[in-house]
From Swiss-Prot:
InterPro entries listed in its UniProt record: Hemimethylated_DNA-bd_dom, Hemimethylated_DNA-bd_sf, HspQ
Name of the featured protein: Heat shock protein HspQ
Superkingdom field: Bacteria
Region (Disordered): 77-105
Species annotation: Salmonella arizonae (strain ATCC BAA-731 / CDC346-86 / RSK2980)
Record localization: Cytoplasm
Amino acid sequence: MIASKFGIGQQVRHSLLGYLGVVVDIDPEYSLDEPSPDELAVNDELRAAPWYHVVMEDDNGQPVHTYLAEAQLRSEMRDEHPEQPSMDELARTIRKQLQAPRLRN
């Protein structure tokens, strides 16, 4: 069994670029159907580790969905980010839904 370092709803930072993001889903290993040429360069060890669907903001404050390897992320210690309140709200909303899921039927 593969253990993931980060959880759904957790705030993380891109380790090279420093962008703040929120984990919205986790794959136990690389699982995109058709990798792009850049993704083909990823080594097998990295592909076998967990990969994360992370929502980040672009330079205009618009949400961007990214797919990142565990090695590309680091933990974010702060819970509040006045410069990016939408990321804080997204993380809170996801964590709240995980704690008390809505029954639809």
